[in-house]
Amino acid sequence: MSERTEQESYTDKIDEDEILAGLSAEELKQLQSEMDDIAPDERVPVGLRQKDASHEMTVRDCTEPESEEEIDEDEILAGLSAEELKQLQSEMEEIAPDERVPVGMRQRDQTDKPPTGSFDHRSLVEYLYWEKESKRMLEEERVPTTLLPSQKTNEEHEAKNEDKVEELELVYEEIVEEVEGGQGDAVVDEVIEEVIMEVEEEDKVCDKPVKTDLDATDPTVTSEDGLQRPSESADANVEAKTDQSGLDTETKVNEEKKEDSTEPAPSSYENWVPEKEERVISKLKIPKLALGGNTFVKKTARPSGNETNLESTLDKIRNNNPSVTDVNLNNIENIPKEMLLDYVNSLKKNRHVKTFSIANTGADENVAFTLANMLKENRSITTLNIESNFITGKGIVAIIRCLQFNETLTELRFHNQRHMLGHHAEMEVSRLLKANNTLLKMGYHFELPGPRMVVTNLLTRNLDRQRQQRMEEQKLQQMKEQRKVMEMYEDSLNLPPGMLEMLGGYIPLSLLQNCQNGAEDIPEDSPEPSPQPSPPHQLCKTQHLAPQQHPPNLSTGNLFEEVQLKKTPKRRDPLLEWNQCDERKDGRPNVHLRSVPKKRSIAREGPVDERANLKDMIKTLKPVPRRREPPKVDLTPRDHLLSEIRQSNVAYLKAVPLPKILESQETSLF
């Protein structure tokens, strides 16, 4: 109780009024702010209990002129270098950022690397435009839409307006700081200038003087917030000049200043005014893609990079121009469907186009059916590429069905369609391809393993047939060349035509040597020299049939002694023929004579008989089997026991002695 009474007596001794009376105005404000934080007023909403720091700062600045007189900010700023000013500016942006700037844009630029190129605002806007258009085109592909008549008329009006002169509107936002002071105060005024520039002509720039107006509603800005870096403002000015180069501009200026401005205080930093910051809002003319003046080309189509001139190429195909052998329309998404159908129809009678590619052109079922009809009549196209389109299984099946009437197409590609082909369509494709013998390549991955294997086997079959045809053509070419060689030798040897063929293609070596000697002895003045003999590799077949040695000193008259001629039936002598009437009268029997082949000399038929006898002897021989003896294996007692058990019978059991190896002390009975 004693302690409590002491505390009460101590509080009674403290007079709050005297304490508050002894405090200065600054201490009273500080005490009030602390009391607002410790015990806020409950009648004030929670969201409004936060104290206004900016108001306190302004009041403190107004109520403390003495402290500001002691610190001269202008002198301090004037003594700083350009690098120190930049560092101070960056630090002030981090400590007290501008509340009018969005939070996401308050991050300062921390890159030290110099820019690789100048900033191109126009290219950035075009890039954003094409990004937006690509998304819109994807949405159009997902949900097909049809334009109403009112929408079509609106688009026509927009197209007409785009043809007129576009206006480029540039809005410059200039921040001008003026250091003004009164009674030792340094107040910085912010002047915002908006420059609206309109384009009229090129290569002319007109500048007008700046008009200033005062407005009391502009908030006060401190020197820290309004300080601008000279280098950044200069860069912004250079960017603005690059954007407005070559454009005629008209400027209209509105400026705002703070009310009750006083004369500027003398300082070495007061004449410096930062460069203006420019905010450019431009209306750009998007290029309208006109393809050969066609009126039904999409206005929002993306550039494909394909430089094919559609109209001139179509005219060449219709006129059957032989210079056009490869038609490439890939990635032209804005090609009209009517023009695509005209291309396909014009290829029906064309005889020179070998490759036709329409990948990623938006081809649909109508184009697929037209392609099928074209393949029935066309006899020149070898490669067809219709990948990345909107063709369904029905269109693909129609094209494959028409391949049974086409014998020139060797490569077909239809992969990556918008819709799946389907299992039924894959089975139908594998079935229809059996009737085609010329297709060698197919650009499609089958989902089912069955059709995949069937199509693979069919393409392999077609490749084998093509290889066989190529081999047959080579054989025919070789036969033609050999026939020419034989005719050449017949002419050189003065033999009747077909003589060497009757001889089985055999040409004696002596004839060849004489032909070569004769060809060498022919004078150069002879008008028709005998043809030279063919290379030895073409005569190897004719020489190895009956190789014989001939003496080198044979005369030209005995050349045909070694040639074996075929025997032809002799004609009967009419003097020796009997008259049939006389035979009937005399009653003589009819006698029919038949020719008996003469026996050849033994000397000539000797080697032939020996060969025949040798062949007969070889036929009588039989292969002698090599009977190898089985390897000797020593049988163990266990094997003997098992063999005896296998040979024994249940009805006739007999005692079998136990082998000594199997005996042991456990099994022994004694």
Swiss-Prot record:
Return the annotated region ranges for Disordered.
34-72, 94-120, 139-165, 202-274, 517-556
Task: Kindly give the SUPFAM superfamilies that the UniProt entry links to this protein.
Answer: RNI-like (SSF52047)
Looking at the Swiss-Prot or TrEMBL record, what is one Pfam family this protein matches? Answer: Tropomodulin
Alphabetical GO biological process terms: actin filament organization; muscle contraction; myofibril assembly; pointed-end actin filament capping; skeletal muscle fiber development; skeletal muscle thin filament assembly
Query: What tissues harbor this protein?
Result: expressed in muscle (at protein level).
Q: Start and end of every WH2 domain?
A: 637-656
Gene knockout outcome: Morpholino knockdown of the protein causes short bodies, bent tails, and reduced tail birefringence, consistent with abnormal skeletal muscle organization, in fish larvae, 3 days after fertilization. Larvae exhibit reduced trunk size, that generate less force than that of wild-type counterparts, and aberrant accumulation of alpha-actinin. Mutant embryos show abnormal motor function, with reduced spontaneous coiling and diminished touch-evoked escape responses.
Output this protein's name.
Leiomodin-3
Q: Which organism is it from?
A: Danio rerio
Gene coding for it: lmod3
